[in-house]
Amino acid sequence: MLETQISVAIRRSRRSRLVPYVTTRPNGIALSPNGKTLYVTGSDDRTVRAYDIERDGAPVNERVLISKIEGIPDGIRVDDKGNLYVAAKEIYVYSPAGKQIHSINMTEPPSNLAWGDADFGTLYVSARTFVYRVQLDAKGSVQY
């Protein structure tokens, strides 16, 4: 298997960094609310990998945070408490430690996610045929 690399631009350092990724098809990407952890979904190996972000912006300490996700992980978003929302067979919600705490059943497999509305309490979800609007008690983490 060929190693894939991801280029990540971190604002603090204003430089791009290549992040070694030990499988193919890295897909979704998100940052923790404090900007200290980078999350990347892996479509081929059905994982979420986490990287620590050093002070200079370098991603280090790659680790598999979540494995054996049912379905093919695609989009990922983080709420203001650091919980991860992973679009796969349905939307799986994980704690920052990688423990599944909830799931949101969809009528079709979701592909990507975005926080929206004035309070960022709505998760917009794209799928094959529709874009869904899911009202949540959680609030999105604005990262971009």
Feature roles, as predicted:
Residues 1-10, 142-144:
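Blade/loop signatures of beta-propeller domains
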Residues 1-6, 15-40, 68-83, 87-88, ...:
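Beta-rich, blade/repeat-based domains predominating
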Residues 4-7, 46-48, 91-92, 131-133:
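Structural signal for beta-propeller blades
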Residues 8-25, 52-69, 93-106:
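Blade-edge beta-strand/turn elements of extracellular beta-propeller
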Residues 30-51, 55-63:
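Glycine- and Gly-Pro-enriched alpha-helical subdomains that act as flexible
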Residues 43, 53, 89, 128, ...:
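Short loop/turn segments immediately following the C-termini of beta-strands
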Residues 51-58, 135-143:
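Short loop/turn segments immediately following beta-strands, especially the blade-tip
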Residues 116-117, 121-142:
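Short glycine/proline-enriched turn or capping motifs at secondary-structure junctions
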